[in-house]
Structures are given as C-alpha cells and as structure tokens.
C-alpha cells in the first residue's frame, strides 16, 4: 500500500490572511486505486474570482492558486495514473473544495456518509450547489468501514454531520490518519474551538477521538488545511509507503 498527497490549489482566508492548501489523496492497495476528494469545480479555472463570488465564497476568502495542474486528472497524471484507473472514490464531505469534480470518475464506487448522501445535493457552500450527486455505484457509510484491509473510513461528524476521516496503515511508514476537515489545523485542538463546524460539540468529540487515536497508534495525523504542515509534506509525484 502507498499514499500520495495531491495538490488542488491554495486558498486565502480573509479573516486572518491564512493561506491554506487544498489537498486530495490517492492510495494504491493491491488492484485498488482509491481517490479521496476532488477539489474545486472546473469552473474555477477560467474565472476563480467570479466563481468564488457566485458561489458565496467571496465573503470568506479567495482562491489564489488554481492552475490546470491542480485538479485530480493532472495530479494523478504525475503518478502515471489515469482517471479511468480509479476504482474507488471517497468523499470526506460535500463542501466546495472537496466535491468539485466527483462527476469525472463514473466507473468508481463512491464512498460517502449516509448523512451526507441523504442531502438532495452535496452541501457545497452556503446552501447552494453547482454539483449534483453522480450516478456512480455508491456505498453509504454510517459506521467504521474498511474499503480494503488497512484502509478504514471513520465517521467524524461535526464539521459537517456527514464528515468522514480515514485511517490507513502503510507497510513502512506506519499508521496515517487523514483527518480532513474534522481537524483543519492543530490550533483547533489547542484552542478547543470549532467555530466553522455545523455542530461544534460533535466536532470537538470527533477531533478529540482522532487525537487519541493518533496517540494510541503513534500515527501521523494529517490535518485538513494546516499551512505549516502543507509546506512540509511530500506531494505527488512523491509517495509515502
């Protein structure tokens, strides 16, 4: 099994000037080719500021880096993988920076939480969505679920009530926890504040659970949008294995 970290762009948060990487993840295990999250919608490539405004993101921040290399197809290409190779597509949650290109992998089995999939469309942003649920074969998750041995989807409600994180065990590197937005950055744990969460109390419980799991398993805890960690991580075409 091996893991690659994908670069889906850079976003600036107006409130604090924080510049956050937009990650995706690709995992190979045996004959399975697993993509986790898909970044922003392709419309952002032509007009990032205009689409930010029309999607209601304009009051929150702006996409400051989004090139034709910062999408799933291009990032997978760095690894010698084509979109048609993807067997499984995991959606951690339905926000705008995670769900934008889920329609580009029609052959893949989609893994999404039951709570998230029960929404008429992905939550996207501010209750408006330019994304529909794809017609993929879909597995809905409401409890810890192994995709394959060594890759477990873990419900982590709070940021959204259908949020999923992943726990995987790499043969040499060891255990990795992909928290996604269940823990965006370590400040959330240090301050014990989850102000952007759909349910802050549930978010707190999920974050504490993941932290305890990381301590217990001596795991690498990968945050969803930590500027410092983002600068230090190896990204595609490099691997963790």
Task: Map each language-model feature to its residues.
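Metallo-beta-lactamase
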Residues: 41, 52, 64-81, 85-97, 104, 112-155, ...
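Zn-dependent metallo-beta-lactamase
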Residues: 1-65, 209, 216, 228, ...
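Hydrophobic/aromatic beta-strand patches that form the interior of the parallel beta-sheet core
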Residues: 4-6, 34, 90, 111, ...
């Amino acid at each position: 099994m091996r893991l690659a970290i994908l670069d889906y762009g850079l976003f600036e948060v107006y409130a604090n000037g924080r510049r956050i990487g937009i990650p995706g993840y690709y995992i190979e295990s045996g004959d399975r080719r697993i993509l986790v999250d898909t970044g922003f919608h392709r419309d952002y490539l032509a007009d990032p500021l205009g689409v930010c405004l029309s999607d209601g993101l304009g009051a929150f921040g702006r996409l400051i880096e989004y090139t034709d290399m910062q999408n799933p197809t291009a990032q997978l290409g760095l690894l010698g993988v084509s979109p048609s190779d993807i067997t499984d597509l995991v959606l951690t949650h339905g926000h705008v920076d995670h769900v934008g290109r889920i329609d580009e992998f029609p052959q893949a089995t989609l893994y999404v939480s039951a709570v998230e999939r029960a929404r008429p469309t992905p939550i996207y942003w501010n209750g408006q969505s330019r994304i529909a649920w794809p017609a993929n074969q879909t597995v809905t998750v409401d409890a810890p679920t192994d995709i394959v041995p060594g890759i477990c989807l873990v419900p982590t409600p709070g940021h959204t009530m259908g949020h999923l994180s992943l726990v995987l065990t790499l043969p040499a590197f060891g255990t990795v926890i992909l928290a996604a937005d269940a823990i965006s950055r370590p400040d959330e744990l240090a301050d014990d504040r989850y102000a952007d969460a759909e349910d802050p109390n549930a978010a707190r419980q999920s974050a504490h659970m993941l932290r305890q799991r990381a301590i217990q398993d001596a795991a690498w805890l990968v945050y969803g949008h930590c500027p410092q960690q983002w600068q230090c991580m190896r990204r595609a075409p490099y691997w963790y294995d």
